[in-house]
Swiss-Prot record:
Pfam families: EFG_C (PF00679), EFG_III (PF14492), EFG_IV (PF03764), GTP_EFTU (PF00009), GTP_EFTU_D2 (PF03144). Keywords: Cytoplasm, Elongation factor, GTP-binding, Nucleotide-binding, Protein biosynthesis. One of its GO terms (biological process) is ribosome disassembly. This is Elongation factor G. The keyword Cell inner membrane does not apply. It comes from the Bacteria. It comes from Bartonella henselae (strain ATCC 49882 / DSM 28221 / CCUG 30454 / Houston 1) (Rochalimaea henselae). InterPro entries: EFG_II (IPR041095), EFG_III (IPR009022), EFG_III/V (IPR035647), EFG_IV (IPR047872), EFG_V (IPR035649), EFG_V-like (IPR000640), EFTu-like_2 (IPR004161), G_TR_CS (IPR031157). The gene is fusA. Residues 8-287 form the tr-type G domain. GO terms for cellular component: cytoplasm. It is found in: Cytoplasm.
């Protein structure tokens, strides 16, 4: 089967936004106008196509990225293939956003015209910045009371530190929002009728003429800056043609020099088609973005894979989902080469072979079997046994490991136990399945109490995990109180000289290590060897590192993992017969236990960045309450008629905050919270924690 659409006609993009900015509604409209949906699904009544998990429909928030393929005919009459990844907007699911951004070529950032740039928008924007994803901005909900397009544009600069390139101006606002002024064609587009299938083109309203000319001038000035020849021509008074202008805007967007801004209201079906045209005009195809880099497994050198069907096959697994009909589905982005059903693949991260069973093209919750897929495609593979999120699948003859994704450490833990004996075995299976799907969710056993502990990114994250166990796996479980994931570190330098000797008949054990333990600024563990003259033979040094790493998971104060430790092996001794890697491992373990105590161990707690948006009447109460939670207020600012309170608060003091904020503000204030950094625990609190965990 030959390729149906040229790779240049592909657009792999996602829609990213704060919770409630209208993302699901926007995706629904896109699917409706591109012909995939026969009826528009409204989030308000829980009938949306993309939000296909039952819980998402209940909560009205999008949890898992659903991938959808659809088609759009651009202004030039050529059909384009859109692969849309829907991303969640709630802060507990930033991991999902990170995963989808990793495999996208472009994105649309949705803003609520009333609220402008909200906290979660900033978080997602920063993640997109990390992967240099070209972005456009769509100011949505222009029909909402308090909608302010110009303030939203200003916030793109002040809050996100990004250059906004305004392509449209709104005609009217709130209930009077009629349409937009297209600043490239310099014409007005107005939508009528309930489903806004087509816009009428007309003159720019006289009251907007001057403003449109001013913004058109700004647009041209910013666009010509991306190209030297265009800048020179412009300075000599030669204006770019509309075609040249579109090409310049495309170049600037793809190179992430600026971000085109459009506006409308997805709910009222105004402004969606021009946005789809803009996706075609300005967002990159797979060949417009830099080739993905990775490591050549054979040479261990860096390599790149071009977006071409002729290159060796390479794809990245970015999501695993359980489908009630097909079983486990692995979503993959094909970066290079082509893939046929039934072929053998290599998982280079796990060093395992995988046999490809069914291959599916997904449309939100329906699916179609396909025989072959090409570079640029996003597909769901059934029947993979070993592959987890972030793994590379490729041609076994040309093995490569594509860049790994980084996943944050969970900050909150709860104990969980099955309600009945029958649930016991099912719970283990369910938790392992869910952990394979979501790298920010961890399961472990507490060795002393024998309890099962689950850890995640926030209370909502773990609520949803427990809920999914009940719904999808029919497992009823009792859940304990949330616990904080504390850490331990050291505060000063300690030098330990430790000798491990065991002489009890037969082969003995001998190893001497002299190690300097010291704190360092990062969170990771650094090991260095300064052995000269063979005091510790080279083959035993990995044993020293392994020994220390094996006990880093349990600190001396309360058994929490250690952070920010540097260990330097400076001297040692060995015995020709009795020394072994194991002996050095044991010696290093004991040296670390001594060293951690002598190096002034301290407890660390996760500090959360909290942002509360509240009506002015409750600001005093909100600040007083955050202070009582050991919070440090970093500032307040006005946002429209509301006030934003920013604070750093220990996670230990934030449990149940949603209920107290609700009662304090009569349900009118909202908050978002995300992990920021670890900080030493005050000594009085540390003693309590040590007693509790001792």
């Amino acid at each position: 089967m030959a390729r149906e659409y040229k790779i240049e006609d592909y657009r792999n993009f996602g829609i990213m936004a704060h919770i409630d900015a209208g993302k699901t509604t926007m995706t629904e409209r896109i699917l409706f106008y591109t012909g995939k949906n026969h009826k528009i699904g409204e989030t308000h009544d829980g009938a949306s196509t993309m939000d296909w998990m039952e819980q998402e429909q209940e909560r009205g928030i999008t949890i898992t990225s659903a991938a959808t393929t659809t088609f759009w005919e651009g202004r030039d009459g050529r059909k384009r293939r859109f692969n849309i990844i829907d991303t969640p907007g709630h802060v507990d699911f930033t991991i999902e956003v990170e995963r989808s951004l990793r495999v996208l070529d472009g994105a649309i950032a949705l803003l609520d015209a009333n609220a402008g740039v909200e906290p979660q928008t900033e978080t997602v924007w920063r993640q997109a910045e990390k992967y240099r994803v070209p972005r456009m901005v769509f100011v949505n909900k222009m029909d909402k009371i308090g909608a302010d397009f110009y303030r939203s544009v200003e916030m793109v600069g002040s809050r996100l530190g990004a250059k906004a390139l305004v392509l449209q101006l709104p005609i009217g606002a709130e209930n009077d929002f009629e349409g937009v002024v297209d600043l490239i064609e310099m014409q007005a587009l107005r939508w009528d009728g309930s489903i806004g299938a087509s816009a009428t083109v007309g003159e720019i309203p006289s009251g907007l003429k001057e403003k449109a000319e001013e913004y058109r001038e700004k647009l041209v000035e910013m666009a010509v800056e991306v190209d030297e020849a265009a800048t020179e021509a412009y300075l000599e008074g030669v204006m770019p043609t509309n075609e040249q202008l579109v090409a310049l805007i495309r170049k600037g967007t793809v190179e992430v020099q600026f971000h085109p801004v459009l506006c409308g209201t997805a709910f009222k079906n105004k402004g969606v088609q021009p946005l789809l045209d803009a996706v075609v005009s300005y967002l990159p195809s797979p060949v417009d973005v830099p080739a993905i880099s990775g490591v050549d497994v054979k040479t261990e050198g860096e390599t790149t894979r071009e977006s071409s069907d002729d290159a060796p096959l390479s794809m990245l697994a970015f999501k695993i989902m359980n489908d009630p009909f097909v079983g486990s589905l692995t979503f993959c982005r094909i970066y290079s080469g082509k893939v046929q059903k039934g072929i053998s693949l290599e998982n280079t991260v796990k060093r395992k072979k995988e046999r490809l069973g069914r291959m599916l093209q997904m449309h939100s919750n329906s699916r179609e079997d396909i025989e072959e897929a090409f570079a640029g495609d996003i597909v769901a593979l059934a029947g993979l046994k070993e592959t987890t999120t972030g793994d590379t699948l490729c041609d076994p003859l040309k093995p490569v490991i594509l860049e790994r994704m980084e996943f944050p450490e969970p900050v909150i833990e709860i104990a969980i136990e099955p309600k009945t004996k029958a649930d016991q075995e099912k719970m283990g299976i369910a938790l392992n399945r869910l952990a394979a799907e979501d790298p920010s969710f961890r399961v472990k056993s507490d060795e002393e109490s024998g309890q099962t502990i689950i850890a995640g990114m926030g209370e909502l994250h773990l609520d949803i995990i427990v809920d999914r166990m009940r719904r999808e796996f029919k497992v009823e479980a009792n859940v304990g109180q949330p616990q904080v994931a504390y850490r331990e570190s050291i505060t000063k330098i300690a030098e330990i000289d430790y000798t491990h000797k065991k002489q009890s008949g037969g082969a003995g054990q001998f190893a001497r290590v002299k190690i300097i333990f010291e704190p360092h600024d990062g969170d990771d563990f650094i090991f260095e060897s300064k052995i000269v003259g063979g005091a510790v033979p080279k083959e035993y040094i990995p044993g020293v590192q392994k020994g220390i790493e094996s006990v880093m998971g349990s600190g001396p104060l309360a058994g929490f993992p250690m952070l920010g430790v540097k260990a330097t092996l400076v001297d040692g001794g060995y015995h020709d017969v009795d020394s072994s890697v194991l002996a050095f491992e044991i010696a290093a373990r004991a040296a670390f236990r001594d060293g951690a105590k002598k190096a002034g161990a301290q407890l660390l707690e996760p500090i959360m960045k909290v942002e509360v948006v509240t009506p002015e009447d409750y600001v005093g109460d909100v600040i007083g309450d955050l202070n009582s939670r050991r919070g440090q207020i970093s500032g307040t600012e006005a946002r429209g008629i509301a006030t934003v309170v920013n604070a750093m608060v220990p996670l230990a003091n934030m449990f149940g905050y949603v209920n107290s904020l609700r009662s304090m503000s009569q349900g009118r204030a909202q908050y978002t919270m995300q992990f920021d950094h670890y900080e030493p625990v005050p000594s009085a609190v540390a003693l309590e924690i040590q007693k509790k965990y001792a």
